[in-house]
Amino acid sequence: MVTGSDLKESQHAVDIAREHSGLCYATVGVHPCSAKQFDTYPGGASALLSALRDLVQTSKAAGHAVAFGEIGLDYDRLFLTPKETQLKYFEAQLELAVEVQLPLFLHSRAASEDFERLLAAKLPLLPKKGLVHSFTGTVEEMRRMVDMQLDVGVNGCSLKTEDNVEVVRQIPVERLQIETDGPWCEMRPSHASAKYLKDAPPLPKAVKKEKWAQGLMVKGRNEPAAIPHVAWAIAKIKDIPVEDVCEA
């Protein structure tokens, strides 16, 4: 899954999905930290929404765009986009997602009350609800997401602390999705998840970017190739076979 965080990145994600059809798929949307682009876009917010609509309709019809996002709220980084701007354009994009009938690829940081309030008004209009990715919330917040029939995405950032681990332990397997969020959210030796990786199969060797070759990873960058370790840690945390995590 190649994620769009604004119009330009969404177009690039669709281009990658087209070039690697059947292997890569795209999301289309504007990330909350980029939502101020609606007010600076030539022609204003309505023009940007129209451009998003055109892109998502054509790419969905071609089988390349499979979700609307990454959209949501991020109150940890209000210095990037003010709260009221985030709220306004999260709601506008939810309306567009309902119009084009794509499941949601969602982002939420320190904004659970507003996030859930806006979602509750639109989710009944989406048969395929979506995913709250890179989940780092509380057990209570996770349960509310599950009650809303949303899936919960887990990556390295979801496994940093013992509290995070306990949340993951309680996510119903049928509502769990594994992800890397590369190039970010790598699993680190300092994280609470590290002890669950002691007997994990090794990942491909990581080298400096200028020494990269096919089959290797780039040092200091999280990559999709690291997803087996996410699945392995979750399996150990839940005390279930790793195959059950992957098949869920």
Where do the language-model regions lie?
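Mid-domain alpha/beta scaffold segments of enzyme catalytic cores
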Residues: 1-248
